[in-house]
């Protein structure tokens, strides 16, 4: 494609201005500490993004803790993969399936309480660099756990430990406490077209 020299020059000037803005923001970001991230919303990718961070953390030699609060009725590709690294990843599947499958509130509460005991231990361990609390938002949304207690344990974690909380319906208090919040938006999903959940894509 033949571009005019004037167009090339305008592009270069725009990119120079953009680089200056980005460089300035990078220079101003001097605080270094563990961050709390929340992945919520109705779209696909909340847990997938969190497990991508697990892979990234492992690449940096960090130890990781994973607690799954709701999922657990069926095996997943991420569980099968990360269990290959027992020294680096402490992986705990504590749920018994989605809430509409269990249909037993008291049992769900008991499972969530047991899961939080495991999570609290990971959050107190200075050797663990990243903790993934998968579908914790669901447990909080249904009142299986007390938000104040959960936030207290998260905020008392080691200074450089990162935490990722996933699940729909993030509570306002969780959003307020978080450093980074991402709302996954559902634009289109294969399931609505009658396509079954696919291995390697959904699980």
Curated annotation (Swiss-Prot):
CDD domains: CobA_ACA
Enzyme Commission number(s) from the entry: 2.5.1.17
Binding positions for ATP per the UniProt entry: 41-47
Recorded catalytic activity of this chain's protein: 2 cob(II)yrinate a,c diamide + reduced [electron-transfer flavoprotein] + 2 ATP = 2 adenosylcob(III)yrinate a,c-diamide + 2 triphosphate + oxidized [electron-transfer flavoprotein] + 3 H(+); 2 cob(II)alamin + reduced [electron-transfer flavoprotein] + 2 ATP = 2 adenosylcob(III)alamin + 2 triphosphate + oxidized [electron-transfer flavoprotein] + 3 H(+)
Recorded metabolic or biological pathway in which this protein acts: Cofactor biosynthesis; adenosylcobalamin biosynthesis; adenosylcobalamin from cob(II)yrinate a,c-diamide: step 2/7
Gene Ontology CC annotations of this record: cytoplasm
Cofactors demanded by this protein: Mn(2+)
Pfam families reported for this sequence: Co_AT_N (PF12557), CobA_CobO_BtuR (PF02572)
SUPFAM superfamilies, per database record: P-loop containing nucleoside triphosphate hydrolases (SSF52540)
Chain ranges passing through the membrane: none
GO molecular function: ATP binding; corrinoid adenosyltransferase activity
Subcellular location: Cytoplasm
InterPro entries attached to this UniProt entry: CblAdoTrfase_CobA, Co_AT_N_dom, P-loop_NTPase
GO biological process: cobalamin biosynthetic process; porphyrin-containing compound biosynthetic process
Family: Belongs to the Cob(I)alamin adenosyltransferase family.
Biological function: Required for both de novo synthesis of the corrin ring for the assimilation of exogenous corrinoids. Participates in the adenosylation of a variety of incomplete and complete corrinoids.
Subunit structure: Monomer.
Protein name in the entry: Corrinoid adenosyltransferase
Organismal lineage: Bacteria, Pseudomonadati, Pseudomonadota, Gammaproteobacteria, Pseudomonadales
Gene name, Swiss-Prot/TrEMBL: cobO
């Amino acid at each position: 494609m033949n571009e005019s020299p004037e167009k090339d020059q305008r592009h270069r000037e725009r990119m120079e201005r953009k680089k200056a803005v980005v460089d300035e923001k990078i220079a101003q970001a001097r605080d270094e500490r563990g961050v709390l991230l929340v992945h919520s919303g109705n779209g696909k990718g909340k847990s997938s993004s969190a497990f991508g961070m697990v892979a990234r953390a492992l690449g940096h030699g960090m130890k990781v803790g994973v607690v799954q609060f709701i999922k657990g009725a069926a095996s997943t590709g991420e569980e099968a993969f990360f269990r290959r690294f027992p020294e680096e990843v402490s992986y705990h599947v504590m749920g018994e399936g989605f809430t509409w499958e269990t249909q037993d509130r008291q049992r769900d509460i008991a499972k969530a309480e047991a899961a939080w005991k495991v999570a609290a231990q990971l959050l107190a361990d200075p050797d663990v660099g990243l903790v993934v609390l998968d579908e914790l938002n669901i447990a909080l949304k249904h009142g299986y756990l007390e938000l104040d207690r959960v936030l207290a344990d998260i905020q008392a974690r080691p200074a450089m430990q990162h935490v990722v909380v996933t699940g729909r319906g993030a509570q306002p208090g969780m959003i307020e406490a978080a450093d980074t919040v991402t709302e996954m938006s559902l634009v289109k999903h294969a399931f609505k077209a009658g396509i079954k959940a696919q291995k390697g894509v959904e699980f």
